[in-house]
Amino acid sequence: MKPEIIDNFFDHREFDYVKNAFSNLEYSPIPGASGEETEILHWNYYSVKTIYLNDEPVDESWGVIRDIFLPKFHLACQYKTMLRVKVNFYPYCETFHKHPYHTDQDFSHQGAIFALNTCNGFTEFEDGTKIDSVENRLFLFDPSVKHRSTNTTDAMGRFNINFNFF
């Protein structure tokens, strides 16, 4: 599945609501984002807030996903059931860094990344395809295909919502 980009996924009012709903979450830091270093570098982390996991909501912000995102998902793709939803925060750093390639799961399924802000960070696939972080952009892809994230050097951080689903 070649990544499919949907810009302006929400109208302005809906996007402002979604952005505000996810701007004040408490994130848990994940050290060693690159997965390679044994020593934690000052830039080598990201933070995550898990919203949905193992067939159940694990955070109250699931209501926003259920009420705002899922109706649009039905229009944009063949969504049947959610596997995982998490919000990622990649912090600003003076130096631009690409994390190693990874897959979200070992089996083919659908995924989407929704950008909450615009910055010079991006998602890159092994074939060189690069999807820029542009606020209110959703892109659909197969997360079993190797891809990687980046930090940002031109914003406070890179914020996105990651969906894995069938």
What annotation goes with each model-predicted range?
Residues 1, 124, 163-166:
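Double-stranded beta-helix
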Residues 89-91, 116, 165:
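Short beta-strand segments enriched in hydrophobic/aromatic residues
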Residues 92, 131-148:
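Conserved metal-binding segment of the jelly-roll/cupin
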Residues 95-100, 107-109, 115-134:
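A short beta-strand-loop-beta hairpin characteristic of the jelly-roll/cupin
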Residues 100-102, 146-154:
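Short beta-strand His + acidic residue motifs that chelate non-heme Fe in jelly-roll/DSBH
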